[in-house]
Structures are given as C-alpha cells and as structure tokens.
C-alpha cells in the first residue's frame, strides 16, 4: 500500500469523479483535496477556475517534489505553482485530449439545439464558426443528422478539410454576408466574432449558441 502513488483529485464534477475511479482501478491510491499534503500527484479540474479552487492554498500544502496537472492553465496559476515549488503541467495542451474533449462538447451543443429549436435539425441550415477540434466534431455530427452545414473558418486548410468532408465552407471575412441564410449559428471560436453588424443581419428568431 505504501509503495503506491498517491493522487489527490481536486474537484467534484463528473469528469473528476470519472478520473478518480479510473485511477483507482489502475492501482493508484486516490483521495480528495483534503489529502493534498500527502499526494505525489495533484489532479486539478478542467478548466481550472481559480475563483472556486484555492490554488495557492492547495499548492503551498503540497509536499516537496509533488507534481500537479491542470487544464487551461492561466499565467497566474503557473506563477502560483512556481512560487510554491510545485511542477505544474497543462494536460489540455496535449492535442489528443483536445480531440477527445471535443466529442462531449459537440454532443452537448447538439443537445442544446434539440432542446431550443422548434423544428428538427434534419433540413436545418446551420452555420458553424471555427473548424478546430470542436468545430470539426460538431459539423460532421450535424451533417450526419441531416442538417445543411456551412463552416466559416479563417485558415484555408480548415476550409479545405471541411469541403473534403462534404461540408460547405467560407472564410470568416464572409460572415456578415452569409448571416441572413441561417437560422442557427454555433460559434466554436474562443473569441467574440458575432458583432452587432452580423447579429443585425441574422434572421429574426435565429438561435445562436456561443
């Protein structure tokens, strides 16, 4: 028992609970945040909400040589870890995790669309902004459900990929001109791209998921 790595899982959302169960099945000694001082590894949530997770307090309590992992880490979090003498790694920087994480994000978005729309997704005209992992996962699933999907993306290679998958594609600079053709718009770009000019050109009653 003493030879097993101790992992403190911080946070209680479904993902942290699932991670804790998987680690326990793999043979690690898993505990909650109250055992941070004894942990070899500290598993922080994704995203790391520093307003809810007392990061400085947690890491100051960690033992020397402890290793912490978190997702979407801010510069402030990295500095707190440095001051506490704890090595901190961002697991969301791993490309494969971003791809896998896009799947539940896309499914959650489709769930919102099904709840909020008064008509089927089959036959709908949906504009997807961005074609990173989330945009890709979402667009192909919407197309499989029978929606007409147009991808608006900045990079030419993203638009080429969208077209190779049987989707329509356009540059972001064409967004304002495209807007009137759609009753559903989903922004997967982590930045505000739907300005007042674009919003004014959308159909009345359009559904926007941002």
PLM ranges: what are they?
Residues 7, 29-30, 88, 149, ...:
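Hydrophobic anchor at the start of a short beta-strand
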Residues 13, 74, 154-155:
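Residues in the short beta-alpha loop(s) of Rossmann-like NAD(P)-binding domains
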Residues 8-18, 23, 122-143:
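Glycine-rich adenosine-cofactor-binding loop
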Residues 25-26, 64, 83-86, 145, ...:
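Short, structured coil segments at secondary-structure junctions
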Residues 26-35, 145-165:
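NAD(P)-binding Rossmann-fold cofactor-contacting core
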Residues 47-67, 165-209:
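Rossmann-like adenosine-cofactor binding region
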Residues 21, 59-60, 79, 140, ...:
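Alpha-helical segments flanking ligand/cofactor-binding loops in enzyme cores
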